[in-house]
UniProtKB/Swiss-Prot annotation:
It comes from Streptococcus agalactiae serotype V (strain ATCC BAA-611 / 2603 V/R). This is Global transcriptional regulator CodY. GO terms for cellular component: cytoplasm. Its main location: cytoplasm. Residues 1-159 are annotated as: GAF domain. Residues 207-226 bind DNA. GO terms for biological process: negative regulation of DNA-templated transcription. Keywords: Cytoplasm, DNA-binding, Repressor, Transcription, Transcription regulation. Gene3D superfamilies: 3.30.450.40, Winged helix-like DNA-binding domain superfamily/Winged helix DNA-binding domain. Transmembrane segments: none annotated. One of its GO terms (molecular function) is GTP binding.
């Protein structure tokens, strides 16, 4: 059976792995599963707004309401507010505690249910909450040491990912600004007309039809599309006589066009 040191190493090794994107449906599912396996419990990670970032049900809890939290990916406001007022780990909470993840109506079924809640911090900010629970076994001191380490690791990962996402957003905004600045007035007019033709972020268009409608030459549209594609704003593919397939990669172009209109 792994000892405390081995379990600690397993948790810290999570830092060597990456989370793809906070935009993913449940970006921390894998991490929650790893932590649940190491600590031997059920686990979930929520952000400051109560949105579920990931969870793992190693042991069946058999409560419809808890499972509904996971299906909707959102915890109740009253629970999130209570959890946000936990500044240090609250360990081995009974089913009678307001912070117990076991609903009131299931107390009789899980009289020995235990919940532990740990705040997640990163960069001096409260980023979320790490919640673990068992149906019938208290968390030992060794378990609680692992919980402290786990919440720190999650905080570092969450902060790093937020930083990466921020840098990516800045890069995209810069690319859009630079692309827009290379467009002539006619090309800007063409881009606005082209994007207005799309059904959401992608679609098929015919350059000559758009050119005739807004009173510019087809070459202006072609040049505008080339500039946007070289800047990584769009992807395009010729469909021959059917026109051109267009897909917007950098959605910031829509907001930037509004500024110029």
């Amino acid at each position: 059976m792994p000892n405390l040191l081995e379990k600690t190493r397993k948790i810290t090794s999570i830092l060597q792995r990456s989370v793809d994107s906070l935009d993913a449906e449940l970006p921390y599912n894998t991490m929650a599963a790893q932590l649940a396996d190491i600590i031997d419990c059920n686990a979930c990670i929520i952000n400051g707004g109560g949105n579920l970032l990931g969870y793992a049900m190693k042991y069946k809890t058999n409560t419809d309401r808890v499972e509904e939290f996971f299906e909707t990916k959102q915890f109740p406001d009253y629970y999130v507010k209570s959890a946000s007022r936990v500044y240090d780990t609250e360990a081995n909470l009974s089913v009678d505690n307001d912070l117990s993840i076991f609903p009131v109506e299931t107390k009789e079924n899980f009289q020995d249910g235990i919940t532990t809640i740990a705040p997640i911090y990163g960069g001096g900010m409260r980023l979320g909450t790490f919640i673990i629970w068992r149906n019938d076994k208290e968390f030992s001191d060794d378990d609680l040491i692992l919980v402290e380490i786990a919440s720190t690791v999650v905080g570092i990962q969450l902060l790093n990912l937020q930083t990466e996402n921020l840098e990516e957003n800045i890069r995209k905004q810069t690319a859009v600004t630079m692309a827009i600045n290379t467009l002539s007035y006619s090309e800007m007019k063409a881009v606005a007309a082209i994007l207005g033709e799309l059904d959401g972020l992608e679609g098929r268009l015919t350059a000559s039809v758009i050119a005739d409608r807004i009173g510019i030459t087809r070459s202006v549209i072609v040049n505008a599309l080339r500039k946007l594609e070289s800047a990584g704003i769009i992807e395009s593919r010729s469909l021959g006589m059917k026109g051109t397939y267009l897909k917007v990669i950098n959605e910031g172009i829509f907001d930037k066009l509004k500024e110029y209109n």
